[in-house]
């Protein structure tokens, strides 16, 4: 694996890219990072992900792997000698996959609509977002990490969104620390890991970016 | 595994349930089938899938596994001695997962909207559906099965929709056999398998069901 060529096409604010960066760091995989604005659609992005033309794309020895959750599975399988990402038990694995899918299917939409909408729609979206935070906190329960004692797949899947939490709080007018203390303790625990901290974007820079997006989406 | 208790909560027209039935049959797993109308939300369904309250739910020794693609992975891992479902190579596995996700993220919506919409929306949906069929045919290429020489994960993921093909053709006013001959040859190849044939619902019964749904959705 020493001569592997690993490239990550990613865009700095992407919660999905942050996941992949965490996983690569957990495994100690060195890679070349290529900043790729997904609004631009560079020839390399189109070549590597012709179907969705989205980042992140992980390119391993010339072969593209698309979609962040699929990348986590791939990274875990290929670099299997370092810290495992997915649980080894099939049932625990199915639960981790279920909740990661929940995050992208249910949590994702209100997580950005909370800063992109106004009025009645905003109120409905905020309510939904808070419900999903609650659900995710309940699923964590009193475990240190989602998978139990060890940081892994579902922690990565949700911590990918961490850089966006402050923007959600600002435009949603709520405090994660006040409303979800257990989840907050968990985020602090995850933030003790270098793999997590180094992968995350600065929360204030995300807020500046959100102002740009709000103009783009006509919400400001 | 001989004393395993396996229950499948499923509803006969579900393309997702048909996938799981195919996978269980491929592995030779015996199970109890419990017909579960997802519009009704039985106490057992709510208990086993409290988040989405959707079928299919695979219950293995009392533990629920939700979401059909996650079930395929689970079945492949737990009953690993019989015919493999996923490719063993991590890159091929990532491709199979990518395309299965494409089917549910992109193909699914137009696959039902083609019989649930009218007028301009219908025309747009039909165009999209045909494009996705073309994309899926191109991905198959000249391979006998999606994974190569052996029937597996992505074949199951797409063949789950087969019982609905006739309804798509009828309300979309197109012929899969004429437009997508390579895909048609592949469906015929898959239909030679008992695991597939036994899992599928009758296409004409699906069309009758579509008439019921069209009334429900106000499209008739």
From Swiss-Prot, chains A, B:
Example of a GO cellular component annotation carried by this entry: cytoplasm
Annotated GST N-terminal domain residues: 4-83
UniProt-listed InterPro entries: Glutathione-S-Trfase_C-like, Glutathione-S-Trfase_C_sf, Glutathione_S-Trfase_N, GST_C_Tau, Omega/Tau-like, Thioredoxin-like_sf
Subcellular location: Cytoplasm, Cytosol
Domain GST C-terminal: 89-210
Pfam families assigned to the protein according to its UniProt record, in alphabetical order: GST_C_2, GST_N
Enzyme class, UniProt record, top EC level: transferase
EC number: 2.5.1.18
Annotated glutathione binding sites: 14-15, 40-41, 54-55, 67-68
Keywords: Cytoplasm, Detoxification, Stress response, Transferase
Ranges in a coiled coil: none
A Gene Ontology molecular function term of the record: glutathione transferase activity
Catalytic activity: RX + glutathione = an S-substituted glutathione + a halide anion + H(+)
Alphabetized PROSITE patterns for the sequence: GST_CTER, GST_NTER
Induction statement: By alachlor, metolachlor and benoxacor.
Gene Ontology BP term (one): toxin catabolic process
Function, in words: In vitro, possesses glutathione S-transferase activity toward 1-chloro-2,4-dinitrobenzene (CDNB). May be involved in the conjugation of reduced glutathione to a wide number of exogenous and endogenous hydrophobic electrophiles and have a detoxification role against certain herbicides.
Similarity comment: Belongs to the GST superfamily. Tau family.
The protein's name: Glutathione S-transferase U26
Source species taxonomy: Eukaryota, Viridiplantae, Streptophyta, Embryophyta, Tracheophyta
Gene giving rise to this polypeptide: GSTU26
């Amino acid at each position: 694996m020493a001569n592997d060529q690993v490239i990550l096409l990613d865009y700095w604010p992407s919660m999905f890219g942050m996941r992949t960066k965490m996983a690569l760091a957990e495994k100690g995989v060195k890679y070349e990072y290529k900043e790729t604005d997904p609004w631009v659609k560079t020839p390399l992005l189109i070549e590597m992900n012709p179907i969705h033309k989205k980042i992140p794309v992980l390119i391993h020895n010339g072969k593209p792997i698309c979609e962040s959750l699929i990348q986590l599975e791939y990274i875990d399988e290929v670099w299997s000698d370092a810290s495992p990402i997915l649980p080894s038990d099939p049932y625990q694995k199915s639960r981790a996959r279920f909740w990661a899918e929940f995050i992208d299917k249910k949590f994702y939409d209100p997580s950005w609509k909370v800063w992109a909408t106004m009025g009645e729609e905003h109120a409905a979206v905020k309510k939904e977002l808070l419900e999903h935070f609650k659900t995710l906190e309940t699923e964590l329960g009193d475990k240190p990490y989602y998978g139990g004692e060890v940081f892994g797949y579902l922690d990565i899947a949700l911590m990918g969104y961490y850089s966006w939490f402050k923007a959600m709080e600002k435009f949603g007018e709520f405090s994660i620390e006040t409303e979800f203390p257990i989840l907050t303790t968990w985020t602090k625990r995850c933030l003790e890991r270098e793999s997590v901290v180094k992968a995350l974007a600065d929360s204030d820079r995300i807020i500046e970016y959100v102002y740009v997006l709000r103009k783009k989406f006509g919400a400001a």
